[in-house]
A protein has these predicted regions:
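Core nucleotide-handling region used for phosphoryl-transfer chemistry
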Residues: 3-176
């Protein structure tokens, strides 16, 4: 089956495809997902306190976005699943003899994805230009534009690079 730009079905997509009342079910315990809708899009994000991270559907809900087409929903933006930091009980078992550690800096995750045009999202908002930055009059979309203009000269120059890799509609670009 084809699920947006992804060739296999994850647990969350399977749940959505097999439950017509998925929004109501996933918003309640044990999932407690935050579901934000904007037009034909729905963004799903776990709740750090109330969601049950033993469930794969919860771990996959890290700002993924689905698009409605009639009665069906297709995954079109999948940043990556929940992961845990070193020392946390659910952290991956790392083979340190083969690992290379550089640096991990926490930030705000934003994604660039294609659906009849390029879209910027945060992990909690479908449209980054509707996501306010605390303490400022700017949005995350404004900050993205400023950073791109500084580094690439213009958003158009940056999008030429994003278009050149052939990923349009097939992958999610992630920035933090």
């Amino acid at each position: 089956p084809y699920f947006g730009g992804y060739s296999s079905m994850n647990a969350l997509t399977y749940f959505i495809s097999t439950h017509k009342d998925w929004q109501e079910l996933l918003a309640r315990p044990p999932y407690n997902l935050q579901i934000k809708c904007d037009g034909n899009y729905a963004l799903l994000k776990y709740n750090m306190i109330e969601s049950n991270f033993d469930l794969p559907e919860v771990c996959e809900a890290r700002g993924c976005i689905y698009k409605r087409d009639g009665d069906d929903w297709f995954l079109i933006n999948y940043p990556f699943s929940k992961f845990w930091n070193y020392g946390e009980s659910r952290a991956a078992n790392i083979k340190w003899e083969n690992a290379v550690v550089t640096e991990k800096i926490d930030g705000s995750m934003v994604t660039l994805w294609w659906d009849e045009g390029w879209h910027w999202s945060t992990s909690g908002t479908i449209d980054a230009f509707a996501a306010p930055v605390n303490g400022t009059d700017k949005t995350f979309g404004n900050l993205i534009d400023e950073a791109i203009n500084y580094r690439y000269g213009s958003v158009e120059n940056f999008l030429k690079i994003a278009d050149a890799d052939g990923s349009k509609g097939k992958s999610t670009h992630i920035f933090e």
